[in-house]
C-alpha cells in the first residue's frame, strides 16, 4: 500500500479508534444501562475513571469472541509489530518475579488502561482470566489480584518458554506457555512447587502491542493442589472484614448480625460448582472480596452483598451444569479460551452417560471390570479405576465395552516403571528415552529433577547448556550465532556461543582455555 493510502488509512484508523468503532461493535455496556436479569455472556468490569470514581460496566464476551476474528493492519510492519509484541510477552510473563511496585508498573505499561486520554472508557478493557478460578477486570482490579502473586504468603517466579509461542491468524492472538515456580510459605508445610507449565491465551489491541485479554490455564496439578488447600472461612472472619471495609456508601448489610446470618448460610452451603473457585457461592469467594475490600471498598463491597453478588454466585449452574444427574459432578471445561467460564456435567466414576443421565456399571468381582493395563477395579458394586498412577475413569459406554475405561488425561502418555504402568505428562521422564526430544536430540537433553516439587514424582526433560529453551515438551532450539556441538567433557551436545568451548577442537586456534574447577572455557585467539 502506498504512502498516500497509508496516510489516509491511519487517519481513518485514528478517528475510528477515537469513536471506538473500527474493530467491530463496542463490547462495553454501562451497568446502569442494563436492566433485568444479567445473561451469562456479560462479565462485570470495575472501571476506575479519571476522577477516581468507580464505574461498573458489563463486557459482552460474545462480541469479543465473534467481532474480532479479522484485524488487518495494512500500514503496519507486521514483522516489527510481532517483534515488539514478543518483547512485551517476555516482560509480561515475568512481572511476578520482582516486587509489587514492578507488578503495578507492568500493568500500567503493558496492559490496556481503563480510560483513554480524553477520559472516555476504553473499548478494550483489560481482562485477566484464570480459567476455572476467576475473572478480573479492568486494569486496576487485575493488577490488584496480580499483587497476590508477590506477598508474604505466595511468590511466583515465571519465564516465557520462547519456542511455545504460536501466533494466530486473527492478527491479535497468541498462545504460549510459561514455566512457573511457586513458593507458598502461607500454606501448611510452606511448600516449594517448581516447574509447572501454565498456558496463556493473549489478545493484543489490534495493530498495537498493548495486552487486552490474558487468559491463563494453570497446570492441572496446581489447580488440584490449590483447591485442596483452600479452607472454609468462618462467617465471623468474613463479616469482621466487611464491617471494617464496607461503610458509608459502600455498606451492604444493615447490621453485623444480618451479615453473620447470611454468611453462616454461605459457609454451610455445599456448592455444586468445582472447588477452589472464586466464581462460586462459597466462603472462599466472599472472604477474598471481603479482604480485598479493605483496599478497594468501591470495587469489592458489591461482591459480598447478599443474594445478588456479581461474582460470588454458582455461575456453573447457568454455564453447563444446571441439569446434572445425581451421579454426576460439575467439571470445568479445560482448555477453554473463553472469557466466560464453561462447565459440563460428567458422570462420576462407576457410571456412564452424558452427564445429565448417568447409568451405573455394576460388578461383583474385578474380572467384570476389564481395562487396559489391568487398572480396572470393582468397589462397592461399581466398576472404577485403581487409585494411583494417574489413570482416570472415562464415563463412556463404548469405552467401557472396549476395555478402555481407565485412561490417562490429555497431554499424558502411558509409561512403565518397575513393571507397572503410569500416566506421565509429556515432557516429564524417568529415563531420557521417554522424552519427546529423544528421537532426534537424544544427546541434547537430560532427564533431571527440576527444582523442588513434591507433587511431581517425575524428572523433567531439560535441554543441555546454552539452548534457547528449557525443554519440557519442546525440541531444544539453538539460535545463531550459537552452534550445536558435541562436548567430550560433558558427554553431550551443547549449544555454545562462538567463543565458548569445552574441548580444544571447538576452537579455530585449537586452544580452549578453562579455569580450574570449571568445565566451560573460552577460545584463545
From Swiss-Prot:
EGF-like domain mapped to chain residues: 317-359
PROSITE patterns linked: EGF_2
Cysteine disulfide partners in this protein: 321-330, 324-345, 347-358
Annotated signal peptide: 1-24
One Gene Ontology cellular component: extracellular region
Keywords: Disulfide bond, EGF-like domain, Glycoprotein, Secreted, Signal
InterPro entries linked: EGF-like_dom
Gene3D superfamilies from the UniProt entry: Laminin
Organism domain of life: Viruses
Glycan-modified residues: 60, 77, 171, 181, 268, 281, 354, 411
Keyword Disulfide bond applies: yes
Keyword Membrane attributed: no
Subcellular location: Secreted
Name of the protein: Putative EGF-like domain-containing protein R659
Amino acid at each position: 500500500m502506498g504512502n498516500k493510502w497509508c496516510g489516509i488509512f491511519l487517519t481513518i484508523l485514528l478517528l475510528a479508534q477515537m469513536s471506538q468503532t473500527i474493530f467491530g461493535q463496542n463490547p462495553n455496556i454501562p451497568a446502569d444501562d442494563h436492566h433485568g436479569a444479567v445473561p451469562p455472556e456479560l462479565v462485570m468490569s470495575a472501571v476506575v475513571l479519571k476522577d477516581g470514581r468507580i464505574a461498573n460496566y458489563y463486557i459482552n464476551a460474545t462480541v469479543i469472541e465473534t467481532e474480532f476474528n479479522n484485524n488487518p493492519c495494512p500500514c503496519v510492519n507486521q514483522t516489527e509489530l510481532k517483534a515488539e509484541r514478543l518483547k512485551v510477552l517476555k516482560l509480561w510473563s515475568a512481572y511476578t518475579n520482582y516486587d509489587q511496585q514492578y507488578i503495578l508498573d507492568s500493568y500500567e505499561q503493558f496492559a490496556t488502561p481503563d480510560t483513554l486520554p480524553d477520559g472516555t472508557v476504553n473499548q478494550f478493557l483489560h481482562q485477566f482470566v484464570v480459567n476455572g478460578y476467576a475473572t478480573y477486570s479492568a486494569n486496576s482490579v487485575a493488577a490488584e489480584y496480580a499483587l497476590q502473586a508477590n506477598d508474604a504468603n505466595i511468590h511466583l517466579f515465571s519465564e516465557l518458554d520462547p519456542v511455545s509461542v504460536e501466533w494466530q491468524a486473527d492478527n491479535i492472538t497468541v498462545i504460549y506457555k510459561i514455566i512457573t515456580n511457586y513458593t507458598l510459605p502461607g500454606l501448611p508445610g510452606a511448600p516449594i512447587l517448581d516447574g509447572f507449565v501454565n498456558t496463556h491465551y493473549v489478545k493484543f489491541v489490534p495493530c498495537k502491542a498493548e495486552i487486552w485479554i490474558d487468559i491463563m490455564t494453570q497446570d492441572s496439578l496446581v489447580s488440584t493442589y490449590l483447591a485442596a488447600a483452600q479452607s472454609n472461612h468462618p462467617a465471623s472472619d468474613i463479616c469482621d472484614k466487611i464491617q471494617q471495609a464496607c461503610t458509608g456508601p459502600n455498606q451492604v448489610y444493615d447490621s453485623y448480625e444480618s451479615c453473620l446470618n447470611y454468611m453462616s448460610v454461605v459457609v454451610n452451603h455445599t456448592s455444586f460448582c468445582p472447588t477452589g473457585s472464586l466464581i462460586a457461592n462459597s466462603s472462599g469467594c466472599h472472604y477474598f472480596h471481603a479482604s480485598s475490600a479493605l483496599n478497594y471498598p468501591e470495587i469489592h463491597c458489591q461482591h459480598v452483598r447478599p443474594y445478588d453478588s456479581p461474582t460470588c454466585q454458582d455461575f456453573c449452574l447457568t454455564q453447563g451444569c444446571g441439569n446434572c444427574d445425581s451421579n454426576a459432578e460439575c467439571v470445568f471445561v479445560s482448555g477453554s479460551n473463553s472469557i466466560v467460564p464453561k462447565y459440563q456435567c460428567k458422570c462420576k466414576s462407576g457410571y456412564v452417560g452424558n452427564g445429565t443421565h448417568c447409568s451405573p456399571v455394576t460388578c461383583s468381582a474385578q474380572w467384570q471390570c476389564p481395562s487396559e493395563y489391568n487398572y480396572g477395579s470393582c468397589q462397592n458394586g461399581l466398576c472404577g479405576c485403581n487409585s494411583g498412577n494417574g489413570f482416570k475413569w472415562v464415563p463412556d459406554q463404548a469405552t467401557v465395552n472396549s476395555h478402555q475405561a481407565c485412561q490417562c488425561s490429555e497431554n499424558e502418555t502411558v509409561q512403565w516403571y518397575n513393571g507397572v504402568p503410569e500416566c506421565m505428562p509429556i515432557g516429564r521422564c524417568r529415563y531420557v528415552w521417554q522424552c519427546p526430544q529423544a528421537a532426534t536430540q537424544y544427546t541434547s537433553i537430560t532427564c533431571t529433577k527440576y527444582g523442588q516439587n513434591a507433587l511431581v514424582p517425575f524428572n523433567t526433560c531439560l535441554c543441555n547448556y546454552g539452548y534457547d529453551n528449557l525443554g519440557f515438551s519442546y525440541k531444544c532450539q539453538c539460535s545463531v550465532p550459537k552452534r550445536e556441538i558435541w562436548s567430550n567433557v560433558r558427554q553431550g551436545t551443547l549449544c555454545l556461543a562462538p567463543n565458548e568451548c569445552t574441548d580444544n577442537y571447538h576452537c579455530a586456534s585449537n586452544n580452549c582455555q578453562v579455569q580450574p574447577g570449571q568445565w566451560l572455557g573460552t577460545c584463545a585467539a
